[in-house]
């Protein structure tokens, strides 16, 4: 057979890089934390915007994030991965971010969604690239969820995210916070 050998997770790792198991556990941990945070952001937004014109859009995105969280809950349990120790922080911070941006207005809530989902799109793409055929289930899950996150980002843009007061500052801060949360939740 002259066919190319299927890619395996962490096959090209260098000395000092995480082992395959550590890499995959970190991915599951951070993705579980991220989906938990996303659910909390939408809960915060809904607490403020319930009954308004943005409610149906936010509720639909929240339901998809809940499905993502359920998927990572299953993996955390099946693979016996330790969840992040920062869950209490993400519980409060996610709700506060959602409610805080919603208090500015529906466009700011959409700007928050756009910023978070843009970072998650990049994050999930990088993860999928690292996963080989031996982690096809996880890779497929991440790619499926990534499509939803991109759709959320695009919907937030359609709903006027760029019209939010202080759009550049707001989205820059949310992106920086999202990247920090990813870095911390992978490790802690």
Regions from the language model: what does each represent?
Residues 1-188:
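Non-heme di-metal
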